[in-house]
Structures are given as structure tokens and as C-alpha cells.
Amino acid sequence: MSDSLWTALSNFSMPSFPGGSMFRRTKSCRTSNRKSLILTSTSPTLPRPHSPLPGHLGSSPLDSPRNFSPNTPAHFSFASSRRADGRRWSLASLPSSGYGTNTPSSTVSSSCSSQERLHQLPYQPTVDELHFLSKHFGSTESITDEDGGRRSPAVRPRSRSLSPGRSPSSYDNEIVMMNHVYKERFPKATAQMEEKLRDFTRAYEPDSVLPLADGVLSFIHHQIIELARDCLTKSRDGLITTVYFYELQENLEKLLQDAYERSESLEVAFVTQLVKKLLIIISRPARLLECLEFNPEEFYHLLEAAEGHAKEGHLVKTDIPRYIIRQLGLTRDPFPDVVHLEEQDSGGSNTPEQDDLSEGRSSKAKKPPGENDFDTIKLISNGAYGAVYLVRHRDTRQRFAMKKINKQNLILRNQIQQAFVERDILTFAENPFVVGMFCSFETRRHLCMVMEYVEGGDCATLLKNIGALPVEMARMYFAETVLALEYLHNYGIVHRDLKPDNLLITSMGHIKLTDFGLSKMGLMSLTTNLYEGHIEKDAREFLDKQVCGTPEYIAPEVILRQGYGKPVDWWAMGIILYEFLVGCVPFFGDTPEELFGQVISDDILWPEGDEALPTEAQLLISSLLQTNPLVRLGAGGAFEVKQHSFFRDLDWTGLLRQKAEFIPHLESEDDTSYFDTRSDRYHHVNSYDEDDTTEEEPVEIRQFSSCSPRFSKVYSSMEQLSQHEPKTPVAAAGSSKREPSTKGPEEKVAGKREGLGGLTLREKTWRGGSPEIKRFSASEASFLEGEASPPLGARRRFSALLEPSRFSAPQEDEDEARLRRPPRPSSDPAGSLDARAPKEETQGEGTSSAGDSEATDRPRPGDLCPPSKDGDASGPRATNDLVLRRARHQQMSGDVAVEKRPSRTGGKVIKSASATALSVMIPAVDPHGSSPLASPMSPRSLSSNPSSRDSSPSRDYSPAVSGLRSPITIQRSGKKYGFTLRAIRVYMGDTDVYSVHHIVWHVEEGGPAQEAGLCAGDLITHVNGEPVHGMVHPEVVELILKSGNKVAVTTTPFENTSIRIGPARRSSYKAKMARRNKRPSAKEGQESKKRSSLFRKITKQSNLLHTSRSLSSLNRSLSSSDSLPGSPTHGLPARSPTHSYRSTPDSAYLGASSQSSSPASSTPNSPASSASHHIRPSTLHGLSPKLHRQYRSARCKSAGNIPLSPLAHTPSPTQASPPPLPGHTVGSSHTTQSFPAKLHSSPPVVRPRPKSAEPPRSPLLKRVQSAEKLGASLSADKKGALRKHSLEVGHPDFRKDFHGELALHSLAESDGETPPVEGLGAPRQVAVRRLGRQESPLSLGADPLLPEGASRPPVSSKEKESPGGAEACTPPRATTPGGRTLERDVGCTRHQSVQTEDGTGGMARAVAKAALSPVQEHETGRRSSSGEAGTPLVPIVVEPARPGAKAVVPQPLGADSKGLQEPAPLAPSVPEAPRGRERWVLEVVEERTTLSGPRSKPASPKLSPEPQTPSLAPAKCSAPSSAVTPVPPASLLGSGTKPQVGLTSRCPAEAVPPAGLTKKGVSSPAPPGP
């Protein structure tokens, strides 16, 4: 035996060889000349094992190469390994070999290794081998069935890819030696092949022939040439193996299959000829090499094992000779293929109608698309080469994005070939994370590419609006981009221009990669290329020395003009991840040269402290930003990146099913506000319009028109549908209606059409459980599978629709039901992938359209729909769900008259803005016309992440109720109703978001409640017809007490709801409460005058109820106190800044309810749910003075709620905060008076991310924080005392205590006694306070983002004149220690959607920034730049009591707290403020401002009521004129209480004491005018 063989076998650890088997190789006959070629070996190649079986063949499908990625470092080390098993081996057409798979997924490649199952006997086949062999030898059929018909050579004694465990050096040596033998024995064959390959590539390379008109075929053509070049290079380098030829053949067959499947062009014949030529060129060398490498001994043992297995499996009968004849094919039917073809033909469509249809469809699909097929809607964005427009296909009504590239630009820049590359890549790519193209065509001046429209804008705009992204959001976006990149790289595509601008966000919140204008097409991935030398070659694939891309994202090797390849994309990915997490790129400079210098030489700067990145993220970015492309993560393939620890818990296969944190909310189907048009930088609209370029343009441009298979599919399906349903002309928006058609054969098609295109729906289609619904869902699912871009309408799964009992009427509080889209005529976008998730609306009796038509100042066409005249929804309304998502910005603006509001008699449909949460509901007949539990939660929504749902503008956090009882009327006997209710938390699935519900905890035996039929354990849904879910406990108690001696309670059995009882939440401290919006009816305002004084006291309670005694005065009338400890407000963690304070109704609207203060919570605060009380960041503490306490304007206006900014809260009750500046108004009393406004459109605010959600890393916020640190020193030495909780605290002491907790300060407790600020001796500016509705929760008090020493810009005259005739307003100025004046916008509040001309609006926007999550900030910030701000709203203004008399404005007090300063004169007739001890307390009640007298004395009844302006005020008040409510004494106001705003409603006139009002002899004469 030769020494070399012994050396090779010495490492082979196989103890149980049968005797003599080790020496079998040496006894085999070999010629002497072959031995001399390979040293002293007895084999034609290097030593090889006696059997393939020790080789690494997967024992299960999981081990098979198709599921294995060779890039795993663990399985693909370049370290030396044992060489005993010199031959790698696998069967030729082994089903699990990885070749039958899609080549691009051949990242997943062979895992054949020589190092596993060494314990097996040499000739013992594995289960997989036996299965394959029995199939191969046991039947006359080819083995190709499992591989989709792909055929491979009959026997392949070698594996098809590199053994992962083998060292490349020894492997390459083996290949080189084999090639040496091969060339020596067959010199002519090798030379012939190389020469033919050279001629082939030269003759057919894309530069030598006209580009193919079909994008798919053009891409395949390019790949064929690349494969031929690669084969030529490998042959010259002596690296060719049989395995390589096998893979080359497989890839060519795969490309050919793609060509046939995905192209309808006649050019397929050209591609077929190319493939055939290339296969013929390589066929002879491949055969010779296979013969040279053939090992008969291996084959013999293989055959033995197969025969044995076949006999055991009864595949071989006893008649062996007949079996052999059959195996040789001598008994085969000569015409099986013909028969098979006939069968196929007969299996097709035999009916003439179907034949005609298919013919028509194919002819339709062949019709070339052109510019006339599309209507341009608007510009989406501009770029360097052209512009992108939103267009709609005229026939299918489907929306697309059309990229128009100016031909002259391309010709002048010599970029025509690049346009074809982009077209080919977009057409060929079929991946959920890559934008798909539908067709391309040329016009006289442009090349046009029609792509899917991705609605959510790009990541660059998102970053610009919100700064750094939360880690989870960045991880998901990055991971989806990795998958897109992996797909492209497998097809040899290098993007070269990766940046956030090219990552688009779909309507479901996922990522799509776009813009391949700079991309290069290289060689598709080959598993045989996974060795060290090729990785280096791959990294230097392109040697064009082009420096192209966006400077901040260009890799060092491109800057240095070295060769580059796929690693340049991984460098850009590192920059992108850094930008996602930090908010800016790591390298920047004033010039590209300076920037490139940093890229090549500088280190990365990492944020530190609170803003430090997670360790895994930092490691990942560092690995991606390696200057050397060979060591850069991803150079060996995307698998290196995917297995990084940063993605440890990520499910790579379920990314698309993952709930996105940010889901775009579109105003309409044509909303492009998420995009930056960049019109300031680029302008392509009329460029080159004067020139006629058609004469001189290159001939290849005429080949640009193509139609992708996906467009053909969509177009033909829409045409087919349109044949079944006649079109009606498009009527005026809002007036056309589609009558319910009779049930017939077409209904099935119509149902499908509705699912695909979002056409208007017949009302009966939405009856629960009807076949139409099921059909709709099915068509949705098929559309989702078949299309790269699912329609918006198809994105919702109507999982909650099929149970009619779960549909109940919603509450009136959902303003969204007011807004209606017109029904689309049947010619409306069938293919409109904008398709609305169709939502039916019903409008009950008594609902007038007058209120609707005045809901907006300028209703958009199509926004309003004529109401149904009857209570049942006979007039169907298919409502655009995109409108509903943002409906709160388009409804009931501030000047809608209360009396014009529709009554509650008709149920309306609640829409959820959540993408997967709630869908359409059919209102049930409800005695109250509304139900709090009307939103059926689909199981998906219950388990979904609340973060994206929180960004929805309107949501009903209520479990589904299968049936409501009729209301139970309870007559009070004495002081008791005889039942106890309790508030419970109901969590949304697995999330930390909960809503508050109320159950009957106990019913007294023999009490009124029991007699009325109330049962313990029932869920209370309504009290007196008003839904109570989402109300906090005190609100429900108030609601019950307001009803006097009789209360109507509607309940439902607990088991009939979808609420399930589970274990206590461990992380309950992180919980966030979802609050609902309430809107009282107009009747309440009039009846409230007759309420008892008890309710007036409740009304006067201060803002934040102290839980332990919030209702202590009511214990005797209702046994509610015992339910408080169990209520959701009880037991908040000590670190919560609002521990033991409970927001009452209004804080729900301001999002200030006390919940999680956990800084770890990154769930965005929803406008509809209440924001958590975030701990105020320490760097932002010390702003002086604190934001003033919120007030609530009328609930009827609060459809849109802005959560209170986290900056407005103090970190803890024990921390000191500075006293307010001198120019403070009486009414403000140190606390924010914020007035949530009904937003007409998204408020134009740009907000930083709350620090509690993620450490803010945006540069803007850093600057803001550093500026605000100036205020910290001021607050450090100010006195701050612990808040006292006992009732015995005296009023003055109580006020003093509160100066340390201004955000929790009560208005009534500090009626104007502002303590002087010591050390601030500047002259005190007199402040005036504008009366009327105070809209903005943001613009009151000192601006939190304004530094101590900065002064506000002056208020413009336009701003002083409110549209409703409000009084002129002068912001008070306060002087800081530095001598600079700080102008504080205390009185001049504005509705947020009003565009102001001075700087105050910007400051208010800055404040608001912290109130929302980054996701919601993007919602609001984008609208200011898109120019789509809503119509300005007119604030409600209180009219004076008598003509000529102006309102008294409460004034701030100076150092002398016992006297009032002179008010700043507003007009000649403005009366002077009361002197002496008379003080006015400002209170907002039901949209009116009430000025009531001193706390101890009731007001004089000399107020003459006078109504407000008709369009602004409720109906005339008929209450007695003495309705000014005295402020209750301090003993009745708990330390944390506040007025229960909304329980009583006063006349407008009581808000304005007339001139000359006499109180205890103190007259208020009018001061002289200014």
C-alpha cells in the first residue's frame, strides 16, 4: 500500500471496518501510467474512501442542502480538516441536493461533508439514500418528479458543493490536480471549450446585441452570459469539477424555466437558443471529466445497496430478468409522451366560453401599455434623473407609481444602459421586500416605469421627522432589508445605492427596497463558489472604477477605486443601521472629499450614557463597517448577518407576519403626504419640452417597452371581472349609489371583485356569515398570494365579521362615523390596490346631514355622503378605511353648533384604525343607539402588539359582546341603589394596554337593584344610555349620581363577552390605559342647571382625584368606596409620578391618566389611548415655570386627543420645582390649562421622541436638552416640599406644598395667589387672558422647549384677531435673571391646526413633539411639510353680557397677594378687575369659561344670560340666571381633586361678568382705553 494512502487514512476514525476492507482500494486494478500521474496513489484522484456513506448526506430534509446555508461559519470553516475522506459524494439527482430549488435560494446549498455519521458501516446506506435509490432503480419513471421536472445526469458520484468541513487549500489542490490530469489527457477538449466560450460571450454579451424588450428575458440573457464568463475563468484557472458542470447545467435550466414561466414574449426563443448553445459547448468536457472522476467501486456498492433495498421494499419481483429488461427501458411504450400531451390537452377548458375568455385575456395582456392607459394624479417625488408620479390605470382603476426618466438626460449622461438594468431588475425581482414593476414604456420624451405604489413614504422622511428609531423598529426594518439584499445578491445584483431614501414603508408598515438606477448585475450565486479565493474574487467583481452612490453610504473600496462587489451593500447597511439607531450618519463632511477622508480613516463615534446603543447593535455596525471588504460581515453571504446576535430572537421566516410599529395612516387613496416631493432640489416637470428628441435617440431606447407577468395577470383578471359586471358612469362624488343587485350568478364574481378592487359593496354582502363574506375573504387571500403588492382592501382579514351576534351598535363617541366617503361607482378602481377595506355605515333616524356638512369648514369633495332616510342601512356606504384612520382630523371642527349634532338614535359603525384590529360592524338594534362593546376584537388584534394600534386615531378598546339586555331601571330608595360596582382592567391580548370596564360586584339582597333584576357579576355597558367602558371609576359613579332617584343600567352577562379571566400581569406597572373619547349631548348642558349642589361640588373638584378619598363625600349615597382599591387606579408603583392621583374625565382626553412611567416602555402613546405619565427626563427638569395644568374644553370637541407631553410632568412629588414667573395669570394657578381640540387635520407638529420610550438621540433634541439645562440651576435652590395627603392641611399650607408639584396643582386651591419670585426684581408685566375656548394644550405657560433666557417672537396682529372675534391678546413677558424677557403665551392659545404666522406655532409644535411616540410624530410632522394642514378652526368666544361691555379678564397677582393689579386695558369699555379680596376663579365647563367669585361667597345673581353666536353656541340657556357656581371650600376639595368638568353645563353668559357687576359693594368701573 502506498505511503500517501496511509497518510491520508491515518486521520480516519472508523474503528469497525470489516476485515480487509481498508485494503480493497489497493487491490483494485489500476494502470501504471495513471499511478505515475498522481504521485504514488492508486486512484485517478487523491485518496478516496471506499464508500460514499461516511460522507455528509442529510439524514432528514432538515439536513438536506436545500435547507442548509453553506455560509454558516460553524459549518464552513476554512481551518484545515481531516483529509481521509478525500472524495465527497452524493447522488446525481438526489432530491435534497439543492439543485431542484430556486437557484437564488441556493444560499441554501449543499451540506455534503465528509465528517458525519462516521460510526456507520461503510456500506450501510442512510434512509434518504435508500428512499432515493429505491425510487431511482425501482421504477421506470425518472426521479425528476420531486424537482419540478428538472432532469439531472443519471448518476453523480460527487456532491454538488464544497464540503463545509474541508479546508480550501487542500480542496483547491485536489481540483487543480484533477484539472491537470484532465488537461493532460484531453487537451483538445479543454482548448476547444475555452475558445467556444470566448466566442460565445463576445458574440452574445448584452453590449453586443440589442437589449431584449422583455425585462425578464433581458435579465436572464445577462445571467447566461455571466455564467459563460465564469465557466471560462474557472477553466483557465483549473478550478473546474464535475460538480461545477452539474450546477452550471442546473442554473441554466432554472433560468430557462423562469423565462418560460414569467415571460410571454416571443424573445423566449432567443434565450432558449443561448442556453442550448452554452450546454453544447460544455457537454463534451463535462462528460470526459465525469468519466475521469468516476469511481466504479463506489458505484458498485451503491448498486448493491439499492438492489437490496428494492427487494426488501417489494419493488423488485422475483422475476429478476424481467426487472432488468424493464430497467433497461426495453419494454417502454414508445408513445407515452404523446399520450401524456393529449391528456393535458383534454384536461383543459373544453367549453367554448372559456376558450373565448382565455383568448380574449391573452390578447388583452398582449396589448402594449402606454401613457394613455394611465391618469396622472399627482407628483410623489423628484430625483436626479426624473420624477415619480402617482397614477391610476384607466381600465382597472389601480394605483401605481410611475417613474418618468427624461430621455435626453440619459443620453447626455450616457446612462441608457443603466435604465435598462433598472427595468430588468425590477421586472425580474419577485420578492416581498423588493418593489415590483408592472410595465415599462417610452413616450416622446420619457422612459416610464410603472411600479407598485408604496404608500408610507421612505425611511429617510421618517428619520427626518422623528429622529432615531426605537431599537425594535430599527431591527425589523433592517432585517427586512437584509432579506431583500439576500435575494438580490443571490441573483448577482449589487444595489450600490442603499440608503434610507430607497427603503419604502408599505401600508402594513413593512419595508420594500427600490431604486435600482445604479445597480450592477453580476454573477448569480453558485454553491461551488464558496471557497476562499472566490470570496475575494466576489469582493472585486466589478473593476469599472466608478465612484457612484450617495457619498455618505459609499464603501471605502469604491472611494479608493479598487474592485468592488456585493460587500459594498453591506457597508451601506452598516451606515443605515447606525442612522436608524442614532439619527444621523456616522461620517459626514462639508465636501465629498472631506467625507471620503473620514470614511477611509476615521473611527466611528458612538453615543454614550443614556443614548448608548445596545452592545449587539454596536458590534453588528462595527462588523459591517469594516474597511477591508474581505473581513466585512456579509462578504461570505447574508447568512453571516442573519445569524448575528443582534437578531438572536428574530423569526426570519415570520417577518411579514410581524406587527409593524409604524403603520401609515392615509387621508385618502391619493394621499402622498408621507413623501417629500423634493421640488426645491429637482424640477423635471417641463424639462426639455421644447426639444424633439425622437430623431436622434439611440435605437435601443425603442426596446424599452415591456410588460411584466404580474401586470398581465392583474390586467387580465380585471378585464375578466369587468366583463361580468357592467360599468356605470362615474357620478358626482358623494351622490352616486349602487343599488343592491339581485342575487344571481354574477354575484360570486362581484364579491370577488369587491375583494380585489375595493368597489362599492352591496349592503347585503356584509350580513354576517353570508357566503359573500366568505367569498370575499377567499379572494383576498388569493390576491395576497398572487400579488407582490396586496391591495389595501385585501390587507384586512375580516376575521371578526362572520359572527353576526358580535356586531352591536357603537357609541356615539366615535366621531369617525360622521365622515363618509361616497360610494364608488362600479367603474371605480377594481384593481385599485388602494382599495378600501370596505366598511358599511348606517345612520339612524333623526340623523341629519346638516351637522355633517358643517363638520368641516371646507368639506372635501367626496367626504360627505347623503344620509340614509331610514334607520336600516338601505343606502350602502363603502367607506374608505384610509379616511377613517385619520377621521378625527377631518370632522367636527370647533365651530360646529351643538344643537346641530345628530342625535344618538341611530347606531354607527366603529372603525378601527388598526391595520389588523377591528373591521366593519353592522350595528345591532340598540335601545340606546350606542354600545361601548361594539368592536369585535379579532383574535389577531387581541394578540397583536399594541404599539401600532396605539397610533390609530380612533379605537374602541372594548371586548365583543354577543348580546345586550334591555336596560334595568333602578329606583333609589333613600340613599342607596343597592349595588356595588367595581372597575376592572381588561388587557388587550398579551399587551400591556388595557381598558377599564365596570362590573356589578355585589347586589344587596332585597335592595332596589335586586328588585330591578340586576345580577352580580354582570358587565355594565351603559348608564342612562351612555356607554361606560373606558371611563374611570369616579366617572361612572358621577354618571349614576347625576341621574337622581332613577338610573337605567344596561348590563350583559360576563360570559357573553370576549373578556377572559387570566392571571395577574407581572409587568402591570408598565400597563397603559386606553381611554375613550366622550361627548355629551346638547341636552345635558341644559339640564345640568337643575342638578343638586352636590354635583356642582363635584364639578369644582380639582384635576387629579386622590384615590383614597376621591369620593369620600359620596360614600353614603353609593357604596363605591370599597371598589376603589380594586379599581385600575389603585396600587400604582411608587415610582410613578402620579402615584395615588387619578385623572378624572378630562385627563383622558389629554392622555394624562396615570399609568406606566417605565422608561423601558417603547409603546407609542396613542391619541386615542391615554399616554403614560412619563418620568420627566432629568435634563429637561427645571423648566420654569412648569406647564400649567390641563383643562378640558367640551368633550364634544375632543375627538382627537393630544397626550400631555412627558416634558410637562415632574419627575416625582418630592422634587422641587421653581415657582412661576411673575407674569402669571390668576386663572392658570401654576398648572397647565390645556384644551384638547378637535383636530381637523393632523396638527403640524414635529416632536422629539419621549425619553421614556427610547433614549432620544436626535441632534435636535440634544440641543434642546442642553439649552434647557440652563433652567435646572434655577430650580435647584427653589423650595419644594413633600405633598401632604391629609385632609387637615390648611389652605395656605396646602398651596405652599403644591408649589413643588405644579403640574398637579389645583386651580381652586390657589385662586390667584401666585407667590412672588424672589430675586426677580424686574418690572412685572401685566398679563391679559383671552376669554372663550382655550384650544391648545401646548401653548400655555412657558414653552418647555424655550430656554430660560430666550424671548418669544412678538404676536402678529393677525394672530391677535381670532377668527371668531376673540379679544386681542398680549402675551405676558417675564424677565429672567439674565435680564432678558421671556414672553409667555398664557392667554393666547390657539387651535393646533390653525397655521399661525409668528413663531408661537412652531414652539407649540416643539412642545407637542414629546407627547407622542416617534411613530405618531411622523403622522403629524409630515403634514406640515406636505401642505395639507386642515382648515383653520374658529375658537369659541364668549359674548359680553351687554352690548358695549367687555369681559373681565383675571389678572396675575404681584408680590402683594392680597391685591389685584390693574388689568391691561383691552378696549375703552373694559371694566377694571375687582379689587380687595375679590378674586375670580377661572373654570372651563362644557366649552364655556366661567368666572366665579371668591370661594366663600356665592356669586351675585345679576347675570343676564345671552346666547353665543348661533354657529358656535348651544341652544339658548333656559337656566336661572344665578347659575354661577361658588367654589366649594377647601375642606371639600381633596388635595388632589379637580373640577369634574362636563358634569354641569352653564349658560355662556355666566362666563362673563358684565361691566359694573357689584359684589359686596365693590364696583368695577371700566378703565380708560389704551
Swiss-Prot record:
**Consequence recorded when altering residue 93 to L:** In a patient with neurodevelopmental abnormalities; uncertain significance
Cofactor(s) needed for function: Mg(2+)
User: What residues form the catalytic site here?
Assistant: 497
Coiled coil (residue ranges): none
| Substitution effect: residue 915 to T | In a patient with neurodevelopmental abnormalities; uncertain significance
Per the record, which residues fall in region Disordered? Answer: 23-80, 94-117, 139-171, 340-374, 717-909, 929-965, 1065-1184, 1200-1293, 1305-1570
In alphabetical order, the GO MF annotations are: ATP binding; magnesium ion binding; microtubule binding; protein serine kinase activity; protein serine/threonine kinase activity
EC no. given is 2.7.11.1
Q: Where does ATP bind?
A: 380-388, 403
> Which residues are modified to Phosphoserine?
90, 139, 167, 346, 687, 893, 952, 1413
Cellular localization per UniProt: Cell membrane; Cytoplasm, Cytoskeleton; Cell projection, Axon; Cell projection, Dendrite
Print the keywords alphabetically.
ATP-binding, Cell membrane, Cell projection, Cytoplasm, Cytoskeleton, Disease variant, Intellectual disability, Kinase, Magnesium, Membrane, Metal-binding, Nucleotide-binding, Phosphoprotein, Serine/threonine-protein kinase, Transferase
UniProt biased composition (Basic residues): 1067-1080
List every position bearing Phosphothreonine.
351
In which tissues is this gene expressed? Expressed in fetal brain.
The entry's stated outcome for residue 1240 to Y is: In an ovarian serous carcinoma sample; somatic mutation
User: Which proteins does it associate with, and in what oligomeric form?
Assistant: Interacts with the microtubules. Part of a low affinity complex that associates with, but is distinct from, the postsynaptic density. Interacts with SNTB2.
Q: What is this protein called?
A: Microtubule-associated serine/threonine-protein kinase 1
Which gene is the coding source of this polypeptide chain? MAST1
